[in-house]
UniProtKB/Swiss-Prot annotation:
Subcellular location(s) of the protein: Secreted
Gene Ontology molecular-function annotations: aminopeptidase activity; dipeptidyl-peptidase activity; serine-type peptidase activity
Pfam families in the cross-refs: DPPIV_N, Peptidase_S9
Family of the protein in this entry: Belongs to the peptidase S9B family.
GO cellular component: extracellular region; plasma membrane
Highest classification ranks of the organism: Eukaryota, Fungi, Dikarya, Ascomycota, Pezizomycotina
This protein's name: Probable dipeptidyl peptidase 4
Entry keywords, A to Z: Aminopeptidase, Glycoprotein, Hydrolase, Protease, Secreted, Serine protease, Signal
Documented EC number(s): 3.4.14.5
Signal peptide: 1-14
Gene3D superfamilies registered for this protein in UniProt: alpha/beta hydrolase (3.40.50.1820), Dipeptidylpeptidase IV, N-terminal domain (2.140.10.30)
Sugar-modified residues: 35, 78, 101, 110, 169, 218, 465, 490, 665
Length: 765
């Protein structure tokens, strides 16, 4: 069947934006304080997230009211009925999932956090007629890792002790019995949760509920990293710290192996399915998706170890035969795991079935239709812009709703594209700078349109094919009123042109009561990691950056610069950092600082840089350049040597240590001259309980600096006992920002040739 690749742009009327195309500056006189921005945010917009449900009427959803009760509401009529009264909600309820026919509720209680996404809990099933509760497992003790209704509601798959179980009204069946510290069934291990799946589950029901696909991870041979907890949530420290033994593969170390399993629920038969796309020791499974309306085909997106080759392997469930239906070579950089595969079915008059996915095979991330049986894909979108998310697939109307950077890489506008006509239609006025998102009802007839900035966010309800809102869901009127009392920093956006001709997105925040006749210190606030984005026209929280631009004793300008390697500007822009992390990113931040220093309102002698995580690493690489462009560096929870970080993230960008030894050496922070010469010194902050970027990074860096003779005048170090990567344990977060405020104040007041202790004037042998 022949398809035209001509992509039409629809001319239908789009929704107007009842907000200003820039961030608010307030209309009052009050300045934001530290307590209002860091300790407890005084002004913060809210938004609702609804769980759409399938009933006889489109537009119904379930939500938990402020009193704790569960209610069903028609978003169209606003009629509400109570599903579970507040006094019948289980004590200590953490989350809930509704049975497909609304007859029961699955509750999670007794929550205990594990890693970024995962947690342990008890689970209860509540009948909404009788309100009776029964435990999912009679002997549960806050140890269930995950639970999920089947699409038909006649079963619950859950994971306990790293084993998969299936509950039905009649009984509970244990599907696997080899789960343990090194074997994970149906849930990811640490590295798959953190770097690949980005979630706490690794099991998927078929659309008809007849089969369950799940992944099995084997950590045998994966090296262990020990994280000590000195206080361990006690008021008085125990004599010996608790030690977390975490299987954490670092660069070129053994990775967990992964295996696909299929379970037929009717018979209880479980079958391992070999995925031979790559050698078992090299194989990474990034995504599992059912490409069928029933249970005929399940597909896995497989990557090689360094994630620059990809194969989509389809499994015929009846025969268990496998077939590679799509393959990519991304050895010019890396291939992102976007978790966006979804079944479409036949299109047009053809009986051939398709699935949709986001791919940057054209050099820009776009929507493509791929044949389930394999073959040439069809481009649904194209151009020098990128699709950032698929929001909804409306099969009856043959439409895909998506977000993209079509207007600018710092913006997100909402569009639909028809796979029948190939016509792209904006749902909002995409000529107005903004960031949008949307949530579509179960039958696709309505959607909540969320405006996310740069002005104060709001949410309206729309019917499809209408540009008039049915009603406002969230107005954030209190925020609008609150801003009338304050005067806020002024946020602007612009681009810097590199000598290469490429451009960098910049977000500038000017202090309250800014005067072009004064000179202000500047704080750069980069993240800068591969594929990331900080410069966005979304609402900018009134946080620490707003505070330092408001406090009359600080009055810092802030610059946030998205360097080369960051996201949403095409594959070539992001992939040029491959195998040499830290080089181009640091060069771009230095270039931006040099441009800032030329501005008449910038105090060129006081330009600081502060970053967290990858931003902390980038800050170190900037200081290492010894450029003189920056006068102070603050590194929070930084990587200092990529050999210390996990394999699946690091090797995606740096490849293996064996193949790129020179690149790893160059990317590590080891040159000390910049640390000795930076005029205002460096502050390094890190949590000792960081299970992501280990404290080892800061410890090794500090030892390198001290051993090379960096003086106490130039180096300050702060650890946070038992804090993880977010640094919040026992008030660590507030302390961190107070310390940062103090250093910025000292830097602003620092004289270029001040008095110093005699130790700093001579070498110490």
């Amino acid at each position: 069947m022949k398809w035209s690749i001509l992509l039409l742009v629809g001319c239908a009327a789009a929704i107007d934006v009842p907000r200003q195309p820039y961030a608010p500056t307030g209309s009052g006189k009050k300045r934001l304080t530290f307590n209002e921005t860091v300790v407890k945010r005084a002004i913060s917009p809210s938004a609702i997230s609804v769980e759409w449900i399938s009933t006889s009427e489109d537009g119904d959803y379930v939500y938990q009211d402020q009193d704790g009760s569960l209610k069903i509401q028609s978003i169209v009529t606003n009629n509400t009925q109570t599903l579970v009264p507040a006094d019948k909600v289980p004590e200590d309820a953490y989350s809930y999932w509704i049975h497909p026919n609304l007859s029961s509720v699955l509750w999670a209680t007794n929550y205990t956090k594990q890693y970024r996404h995962s947690y342990f809990a008890d689970y209860f099933i509540q009948d909404v007629q009788s309100m009776n509760l029964r435990p999912l497992a009679p002997d549960q003790s806050g140890d269930i890792q995950y639970a999920q209704w089947s699409p038909t509601g006649d079963a619950i798959a859950f994971v306990r002790g790293n084993d998969v179980f299936v509950w039905t009204n009649a009984s509970t069946s244990q599907i696997t019995n080899d789960g343990g510290p090194d074997l994970f069934n149906g849930v990811p291990d640490w590295i798959y949760e953190e770097e690949i799946l980005g979630d706490r589950f690794a099991l998927w029901f078929s659309p008809d509920g007849a089969y369950l696909a799940f992944l099995r991870f084997n950590e045998t041979g994966v090296p262990t990293f020990t994280v000590p907890y000195y206080m361990d949530n006690e008021e008085i420290a125990p004599p010996y710290p608790r030690e977390l033994e975490l299987r954490y593969p670092k660069v070129s170390q053994t990775n967990p192996t992964v295996e696909l399993n299929l379970l037929e629920l009717r018979t209880g038969e479980r079958t391992p399915v070999p995925i031979d796309a790559f050698d078992a020791k090299e194989l990474i499974i990034g995504e599992v998706a059912w490409l069928t309306e029933k249970h005929d085909v399940v597909a896995v997106k497989a990557f090689n170890r360094v994630q620059d080759r990809q194969k989509v392997v389809a499994v015929d469930v009846a025969s268990l035969r496998t077939k590679t239906i799509n393959e990519r070579d991304g050895t010019d950089g890396w291939l992102d795991n976007l978790l966006s595969m979804a079944y479409i079915g036949p299109i047009g008059e053809s009986k051939e079935e398709y699935y949709i996915d986001i791919s940057d095979q054209s050099g820009w991330a776009h929507l493509w239709l791929f044949p389930v049986a394999g073959g040439e894909p069809i481009a649904l979108t194209k151009g020098e812009w990128e699709v950032t998310a698929i929001l909804s697939i409306d099969k009856p109307r043959q439409l895909v709703y998506f977000l993209s950077t079509k207007h600018h890489s710092t913006e997100r506008h909402l569009y639909s594209v028809s796979w029948k006509t190939m016509e792209i239609t904006p749902l909002v006025d995409d000529t107005v700078p903004a960031v949008w998102s949307a949530s579509f009802s179960s039958q696709g007839g309505y959607y909540i349109l969320s405006y996310r900035g740069p002005d104060v966010p709001y949410q309206d309800l729309y019917a499809i094919n209408s540009t008039a809102p049915l009603r406002t869901i969230t107005s954030n009127a209190a925020v609008l009123d609150g801003l009338k009392e304050y005067t806020l920093p002024n946020i602007t956006y612009f681009e810097l042109a590199l000598p290469s001709g490429e451009t960098l997105n910049v977000m500038q925040r000017l202090p309250v009561k800014f005067s072009s006749k004064k000179k202000y210190p500047v704080l750069f606030t980069p993240y800068g990691g591969p594929g990331a984005q900080e410069v966005s026209k979304a609402w900018q929280a009134l946080d620490f950056k707003a505070y330092i631009a408001s406090d009359p004793e600080l009055e810092y300008i802030t610059w946030t610069v998205d360097n080369r390697g960051t996201g949403y500007k095409g594959r070539a822009f992001r992939c040029q950092v491959t195998s040499r992390l830290g080089e181009l990113e640091a060069a771009d931040q230095v270039f931006a600082a040099q441009q800032a220093a030329k501005l008449p309102y910038v105090d060129a002698d006081h330009i600081a840089i502060w970053g967290w995580s990858y931003g902390g690493y980038l800050t170190g690489k900037v200081i290492e350049t010894d450029s003189g462009a920056f006068s102070l560096g603050v590194q929070t929870a930084p990587v200092s040597d990529w050999r210390f970080y996990d394999s699946m993230y690091t090797e995606r960008y740096m490849k293996t240590l064996e193949s790129n030894a020179a690149g790893y050496n160059a990317s590590a922070i080891r040159k000390v001259a910049g640390y000795k010469n930076v005029r205002g010194g460096v502050l390094i902050q890190h949590g000792t309980g960081d299970d992501n970027v280990h404290f080892q990074n800061a410890a090794a860096l500090v030892d390198t600096l001290v051993g090379a003779g960096v003086t106490p005048e130039k180096l300050q170090v702060q650890w946070f006992t038992d804090s993880d990567h977010g640094i919040r344990y026992h008030g660590g977060n507030v302390f961190l920002y107070r310390q940062l405020s103090k250093r910025l104040y000292e830097e602003k007041k620092r004289k270029e040739k001040g008095e110093a202790h005699q130790w700093s004037k001579k070498s110490v042998l």
